[in-house]
Each structure stands twice: as C-alpha cells, then as structure tokens.
Amino acid sequence: MAGPDSPQQQQVEEKAEQIDDAELAFQGINMLLNNGFRESDELFRRYRTHSPLMSFGASFVSFLNAMMTFEEEKMQMASDDLRTTEKLCESDNAGVIETIRNKIKKSMDSGRSGVEIVDRLQRQIIVADCQVYLAVLSFVKQELSAYIKGGWILRKAWKMYNKCYSDISQLQEACRRRSSDQQGALASDQANHNTSTGSGGRVTDEVLDRLKGSVSFGYGLFHLCISMVPPHLLKIVNLLGFPGDRHQGLASLAYASESKDMKAPLATLALLWYHTVVQPFFALDGSDSRAGLLEAKAILQKKAMVYPNSSLFIFFKGRVQRLECQINSALASFQDALEFASDQREIQHVCLYEIGWCSMIEMSFEDAFRSFERLKNESRWSQCYYAYLTGVCQGASGDLEGAKGVFRDVQKLFKRKNNQIEQFALKRAEKLRKVSLTRELCILGVVEVLYLWKALPNCSSSKLQLMNQVLQGLDDQSSIGLKHLLLGAIQKCLGNIKDALQSFQLAAQDEYGRLNNSYVQPYACYELGCVLLAKPETLSKGRSLLLQAKENYAGYDFENRLHVRIHSALASIKEVVPH
C-alpha cells in the first residue's frame, strides 16, 4: 500500500508544477491502481481546479468509490463532483457541444493556437465521460424514470464521443499527410485543418494520439456494453441511436490502453474485465469458457512490471487461473489481492467473493461459508444473495440447523424487488426453509449456482464426479427437472455427450418446471441446442432448439441472461454458415 509520504506520491507532487496535467493525471491513476486509492484521491482533489483534466480525475475517483460501495451519500457526492467538472469544462462559453469543425474554422479566423483546439477536444471528451458516469449512477437507482433519464444522457454522450472520434481521426490523417508531403500538401493541410497555426503552435502527432486514446476509452466501452444488451431490448437501444460493435469496442479499448492518456490503465482493466468476467459468463464465444484467456494473460504479463503489487491486477490474475481450472493458484492470488487491498474494503469484498466461489468449486463448503458469511455481514450490496450463498454452503458442510436460521434471514434482507438475483435467492431460500432440509439438497443448491454462473467448467473431473454422485442419489420430486439439467451440464463438462443429451432431454420434458414457470425447460432447450450445433448433421436441429428456447418461454428466472447466450450462439452459426 502506498503510504501518505511514499516516494511515489512525493515524486508525483514534486513534478506537479513542472509537467503538464495529462502526465500528472496519468500518474494519479497509476497511483490508484498500485493500491494508493487514498493518495490518488488526495492528489486529484489538491489539483482539481488546476485544469479540467485534474477535475475529471478527482470526479472519477469519487465515482469509482461510489460504485464500489453503493452508499447513497457517496453516490450523491460523485454526482455533484461530476456536475462540477462538467461546469468547469463548459465555463469558457456554451460552445462545448458545437462541432469541432466549426471551432477549427473559428480558430483559424481569429488566429487562435493549436493548443486551444486540443483543449476544446479534451473538454468535450471529459463532458461525454461525465455524462456516461452520471447515467450509470442514475441506472443504479433501478427506477423507470432513472432509466429513461439515463438513456437520454447516454444518447447525448454517444453523439459527443462519435463526433470527437471522427474529428480526431481527421486531424491525425491531416498530420500524416503533412508529414509525408513536404511541399504543396503541407500548406493545404495546415490551412484546411489548422494542424499548425504558425506562431500559435502546432498540434503534434503525440498530442493527437493521447486525445485519440482519451476518446477511445469511452467510445470502445460504449460499443462493448451495447453489444451485450439482451436482443429484445435492442430495438429500444437502436431508437436511441446506439451501435453495438463488439470488435470495434475491443479495438478501441486496446488503442486506449496503449496511449499516454490518464484512462489508459482503466482501458487495460476494462479489457481484463471483458476477457475474464464478461466473455466467459455470457458465453460470448460459443461454449468455450477459456476464450480470451490468451489475451488476458498477455496483458497481465505486459503490465506486471508497472503494477507488481496491484490488488486489482492480482485479482484478474486469479480470474485467469480460475478459468484455467488452477483453483489452488487462483485462491492464492485472491488471498494476495485481499492482503494488498487491506486499506480498501470494497476491493477486499470482491476478493472474498472469488475466494467463496473457488471454495465452492473445490467443494470446500466450510471455507465458502466463512467468505460468504463475512460478505453478508459487511457488504452493503445484496446481503440477501450473500445470505442465500451462506446458507447453502453451511448446509452443504453439514450444519443444517445453522443453514435454516440463515434461510430465515434471507426474507428480512430482501430489499430490491426488481433484482432478479435477489428474487431467485428469496424463492430458493423459502423453498429450502419449508422442506425437510438435507445436506444433499444444499449441495444441489451449490451446484445450481455454479451452473447458473458458468463455473462448472472450472471444476476438476474428480469434483464433477463427486457432484454427479450426490445428485444421482437425490429423489426430491420438486427438483427432478433441475437435477437432470445439472446432471447434463456435469456430463457435458466431463465430455460424456451422449449422457449429457439424455439428461438435457429429461430436463426439457419436466412438467413440474413448466407448471411453475421454472427456468429449467428453456435452459435445457438451450443446452441441447448448443450440443447439437457441434456437428454439421445436427446443426439445423440445434438452431431450431435455440429459437424454441428464445421464443416459447417468458417470465422465468435469468431470462435476459439466457437471451444474451442464445443471441451469441445464433451469431456464431451465422459466422460459420453465412446467409
């Protein structure tokens, strides 16, 4: 942890008046990622009136703190900080929204310098970034009016990103032409694009590259997030004018991560988040949960010297190890990250969550119980969900009376009625509270969440065999369909495709599930479809089952989650067999 008088902080502060704000902001973000959250916050706040960029840095740290805590006071503070930064960026005049092209023309007419062009571009990008973060804070409230407001804020931000991205690209092209042509084209480019203003100064390639990196972070993240919107919501998204090109998003984030902009380290984290969390969870590359790991490992190796003890980078190293089924190594990494984050409670909670999951994967139920119980008691995010995980792990370890007590707590901790995870936790806890509880039913609950969160592929063959053995001996009639779905998923992970197909077919025929609108049937259809897609002779049948899962069921748990996976699977067919 970087201390208050650490050499790293002293070095940054000594340079504060000697270097430009772009470099100071870049170093401030690096300080944050090297476990210096408090020091980074202090640095940005000390210089927040120094420039729009430093003001944005202070507001970003405030936003990050709010998103890690979900505390109302911190979210309000972040909103106030972001609006203050917006006002600072718009303070010179109201023309921040005006097109850059007109500004360049005016700049030429009035003899303004190229430095002012850069300043105006930077301000526009910052305003767009602030708009996005304000929209996110609005979405967190989970109210209809907040969604509508957030959507329109994002629309405004997207237009600004798109315009800035286009104009910076044009300026870069003008610079390249100027460099390659030392005669007539040089004068023409300078006149048309004002990339040099004589005595006023020139917009250099280096400055434009940093600006391109700055806009590419928001531009890329926008593309990536919109590309993951459930298909049935895409019409609404398209009405707002948002695109959703995943490849463009990844390319833009990769560009941003290599730039000298302050958001370069954040773009790196966004790429790691996508490759190790989003991609395997939503099955964005078919059923291969290891897709993207090579990219993630390359990023971690490249940044190891820059962030040797960063709790966040060590956390993502643990995610890679978990996805590679190196669970003991993953546990060690998460434990290291937990210790390095000793001063940052929220990062500790993320690490504890992963330790709990790795323990479930290893069927070390007592260790999982301890992690989730601590989260239930300390975290302000979804104590209801953590209570359910605590209960099933406690029951799976053999403490059935303790588990019953925790399941009773789930009802008291249920707060967010529109949250599908809390709804699921409440329903499952109520069911387990009312039946004659057994260790096997609790293990069924553990295997179920491992399946729903795409963690079964991370389990070793020996643990999968043990899960299979427990489920085979379960005879609870209300859980028959779920039992067959999970047995099919286990057999699929073990490579026993014939047995997997048989179990998925039994799950798809589950009458109890149909009457209770369970997710079992649509998920079983999806699983059957994915297995059949693997062979050319059954591809058509597989596609038909995917469409059946998509169109014949509605209103079940985790519907949006399945729709994203179905959309990805259907898209993979189009790539192989283009229409």
UniProtKB/Swiss-Prot annotation:
TPR repeat placement: 311-344, 349-382, 481-514
One Gene Ontology term from the biological process aspect of the record: cilium assembly
Keyword Transport: no
Disulfide bond annotation, renumbered to this chain: none
Keywords: Repeat, TPR repeat
InterPro entries: Iml2/TPR_39 (IPR019412), TPR-like_helical_dom_sf (IPR011990)
Record field: transmembrane: none
Keyword Plastid part of the UniProt annotation: no
Disordered: region residues: 182-202
Start-end of Polar residues biased regions: 182-197
Domain of life: Eukaryota
PANTHER family: TETRATRICOPEPTIDE REPEAT PROTEIN 39 FAMILY MEMBER, TETRATRICOPEPTIDE REPEAT PROTEIN 39C
Family: Belongs to the TTC39 family.
Name of the protein: Tetratricopeptide repeat protein 39C
Species of provenance: Danio rerio (Zebrafish)
Designated gene of the protein: ttc39c
